[in-house]
């Protein structure tokens, strides 16, 4: 047996979990609480891991803790390995019964509020052995590094190296409140939007330029505005408050249009269609709980009014 295999043969996985937890939390206290261990036992497990490997993994002072170069290398490998191991073990348990274990999901704040939260509530009622942790974040997360099982992303997918499954399509819709529109001439053509006060979304590459299509016609409008936000939910609130016009996804505004709180502008024209995607690190080792949640979310979205009638 080689020296490397000999070391692996005697390696305690609990010690490796302890090391990964300390590195993830950058704190012995937080890691000990997460693992349900005392700080003294956690320190002893790390000491034994370093002794088994014959290397120093981290340095500690009274004020801070840092990983050594070898510690950084081991952390990256161990984090991925233990994540896949947890998923595989959970999958084996799932095959023997219902889905179980922790499910970490990240999605934009507006989508968590309107959809992920309600799907999660129904999901844990259906599968009581599953714990769902929702991370409302508009930034693109490192799924492997943060041990996230599933990300929901809106719009047009980027080549991130992750597996993607489209859940449904949605329309982009120009909307405003009846009160805001009451003080303006009727908006009958795309160029009429140029005289409106617009609310811009700074995360879009061109927040002020919109191209509308109708059959073979195409009209590009250059808008203007004094309000900008980097969050779809903030733009939505500004529109509802009567601050101006903006383009929002149909899944966010369909109910308000039906209730008369918002007016869809230019219903005979279309903006580019977007998609809602489920992203996950591995299709081969996907735990059953993740697969079951994706199907629950797809079923939920299939009942939602994402496609607005062209005549609205």
UniProtKB/Swiss-Prot annotation:
DNA-binding region(s), chain positions: 28-47
Conditions for induction: The level of expression at different time points of growth is generally low. Expression increases when P.aeruginosa is grown in static cultures and under reduced levels of environmental oxygen, two conditions that resemble the environment within the lung alveoli of cystic fibrosis patients. The ptxR upstream region contains two independent transcription initiation sites (T1 and T2), and potential binding sites for multiple regulators. Under aerobic conditions in iron-deficient medium, ptxR expression follows a biphasic curve that involves the P1 promoter only.
UniProt signal peptide: none
Reported regulation of activity: Negatively regulated by PtxS, which interacts with PtxR and prevents its activity.
Keywords for the protein's UniProt record, in alphabetical order: Activator, DNA-binding, Repressor, Transcription, Transcription regulation
GO MF: DNA-binding transcription activator activity; NAD+ poly-ADP-ribosyltransferase activity; transcription cis-regulatory region binding
GO cellular component: protein-DNA complex
UniProt-listed InterPro entries: LysR_subst-bd, Tscrpt_reg_HTH_LysR, WH-like_DNA-bd_sf, WH_DNA-bd_sf
Pfam (any one): HTH_1
Effect of residue 269 to A: Abolishes interaction with PtxS but does not alter DNA binding
Self-association and partners: Monomer in solution. May dimerize on binding to DNA. Interacts with PtxS in the absence of 2-ketogluconate. Binding of the 2-ketogluconate effector to PtxS causes PtxS/PtxR complex dissociation.
Record's protein name: HTH-type transcriptional regulator PtxR
Source species: Pseudomonas aeruginosa (strain ATCC 15692 / DSM 22644 / CIP 104116 / JCM 14847 / LMG 12228 / 1C / PRS 101 / PAO1)
